[in-house]
Amino acid sequence: MPYELISDYEPMGDQPQAIESLVNGLNKGYRFQTLLGVTGSGKTFTMANVIKEVNRPVLIISPNKTLAAQLYSEFKAFFPNNKVEFFISYYDYYQPEAYVPTKDLYIEKSADINDVIARMRMSAIKSIMTRRDVIVVASVSAIYACGDPRDFDTLNIKLEVGQRINLSEFVKKLVKIGYERKEDIGLTGSFRLRGDTLEIFPSYQDEGIRIELFGDEIDRMYTFDRMNRDVIERLDRLTIYPTKEYVTTEEKIERAVKSIRAELDEQVKKLRSEGKELEAQRLWQRTMNDIELLSTLGYCTGIENYSRHFDGRQPGEPPYSLLDYYDEDFIVFIDESHITIPQLRAMYHGEMSRKKSLVEYGFRLPCAYDNRPLKFDEFMQKVNQVIFVSATPGPYELEVSEQVVEQIIRPTGLIDPQVEVRPTRYQVDDLVNEIVQVKKRGEKALVTVLTKKTAEMLAEYLVEFNIRALYLHSELDAIKRVEVLKKLRAGEIDVVVGVNLLREGLDLPEVSLVAILDADTEGFLRSETTLIQIIGRTARNENGKVIMYADRITPAMQRAIDETNRRRKIQMEYNEKHGIKPKTIIKPLMEDIFAPFRDKEEEMYKVYEDSILQMKESLSLEEYAALLEEEMYKAASELRYEDAARLRDELFKIKEELNRN
């Protein structure tokens, strides 16, 4: 079905010409375009209108989970009758497999998978494979290795009313595509049999499937609510898809086992020729154990490291990823491209450096190298048409784009804020006075500093003046970051103090003041791009103001101020010509899509801390004490005081042991 855009608004300001230009560019076959839209100009609404006009499958890549969640909520509201999906990493906690040669320390992979996110990922894959009206909002997880789309497409079960089936064979097919027989009602990825009724609970949808048999014939089929078990829809036909991202056939397993064994023989021979007998023996034992498990169970821990053998790829060939599930004509939007593009470039290299030690010291076969994220050039080869979206596009986007579409005029008539430069002397006292005035107007403030410690200390200091403040930095996980921002928008706090996390894409119309402390410090946190992004945080409020605390004006500050003034001039002239009076954006609170995940947090932290406590045997007492102290302070900063106390008690024991020695 076509996309149906639901909105109370029509395109305004620069949006109509931006939509027309981008749609024309897509229709002309432009491979790369850039939407250079100032903060608050409605870039997301422009994207939504482009999607509606071209009516093709879409992938939107965001630089982090927080912004991905925000975009997901907005597109769900714009397209309630189409498929809007969410695809981010499904790990609540993830410790990758690693080997540290200097300490002879092997760290086994440890992970806690979030079932809710896993279900959302499977829903995204199923939607891409079965529909054209699909928008997937993803993080950079979109370029990581995924299951073979050919398996997902072929390993499904098609059923229709009146069809005759052999029940025992049908159950075997369900098991082959990842389902487990369970008696628990509604357990994701399971099925249960009660007389002539079969109930299936796929991972890619919330509803269960009920199949009623009459003898060996399908009599009726329904979808039903897992909780109250009410029938939702009667079905004439349906397709049951695999319940896991990684499923494969017995033939592929047999072929992979032979191929793995051949690579093992070759690598063991190579290690022995280099005089690495210990490494060769280790690799032989570990890999033969995996081969035995694969042959008997069809699965082993770390099976993803053998994905090249299952896929039939040659060494060095790119793995399958989410991109391979799409039709060739899909469109990619890269949001906040000035940070997402560098991330996409960096992912491959970080993964390779970790795996090098595992292969060289006999923990993994070289095929582990091929379970990886895509290289940047591989990513670019797999995408068809790309629209970069940013208020400050980077040099790569500007260089490759066949057109750059500017969106300077906001639909609300809001203009870029005035920027003041004030001396750093007494900057905190001056800041307190400014925040008090903001608070009186019922508005909010953001303060950006240079270090995490400063963010924490300043937030605590502001509380002493009856200013409700919280800090925001990289050590807070995605769920807690969303919570802090939601509290600001809901009026539960007055100020958020942060480091670089205040820059990108935060949609906070209640914020009328942005204060930049130590604005004249050289570095990436005070670069021209960063400063323009920070200034943009208050561009959604008619009382918007930015204060830079600095004792000199750096070149980066000057360029950011000049660009802001250029935009202000264009906006003010447009408003005067059309008789527009600026007004603050009114926006409802974002849907809290992370709500279902919170129940797992306590269990997740317990698993994480247990893994820390278990490292005692692998480290010296001094190293173990340092690790405990670091994690204790981290837990305290996240307000996990019980966890911090547990780590503190362990630290006291170790220090006593050190003193005795």
Swiss-Prot record:
A motif (Beta-hairpin) lies at residues 90-113. One of its GO terms (cellular component) is cytoplasm. One of its GO terms (biological process) is SOS response. Gene3D superfamilies: P-loop containing nucleotide triphosphate hydrolases (3.40.50.300), UVR domain (4.10.860.10). It is found in: Cytoplasm. ATP binds at G37, V38, T39, G40, S41, G42, K43, T44. It holds the Pfam family ResIII. Residues 24-209 form the Helicase ATP-binding domain. Keywords: ATP-binding, Cytoplasm, DNA damage, DNA excision, DNA repair, Excision nuclease, Helicase, Hydrolase, Nucleotide-binding, SOS response. Residues 622-657 form the UVR domain. Its main location: cytoplasm. InterPro entries: Helicase/UvrB_N (IPR006935), Helicase_ATP-bd (IPR014001), Helicase_C-like (IPR001650), P-loop_NTPase (IPR027417), UVR_dom (IPR001943), UVR_dom_sf (IPR036876), UvrB (IPR004807), UvrB_inter (IPR041471). Residues 430-594 form the Helicase C-terminal domain. The keyword Protein biosynthesis does not apply. The keyword DNA repair applies. GO terms for molecular function: ATP binding; ATP hydrolysis activity; DNA binding; excinuclease ABC activity; helicase activity. HAMAP family: UvrB. Forms a heterotetramer with UvrA during the search for lesions. Interacts with UvrC in an incision complex. Belongs to the UvrB family. PANTHER family: UVRABC SYSTEM PROTEIN B. The UvrABC repair system catalyzes the recognition and processing of DNA lesions. A damage recognition complex composed of 2 UvrA and 2 UvrB subunits scans DNA for abnormalities. Upon binding of the UvrA(2)B(2) complex to a putative damaged site, the DNA wraps around one UvrB monomer. DNA wrap is dependent on ATP binding by UvrB and probably causes local melting of the DNA helix, facilitating insertion of UvrB beta-hairpin between the DNA strands. Then UvrB probes one DNA strand for the presence of a lesion. The beta-hairpin motif is involved in DNA binding. This is UvrABC system protein B. It comes from Fervidobacterium nodosum (strain ATCC 35602 / DSM 5306 / Rt17-B1). The lineage of its organism: Bacteria, Thermotogati, Thermotogota, Thermotogae, Thermotogales. The gene is uvrB.
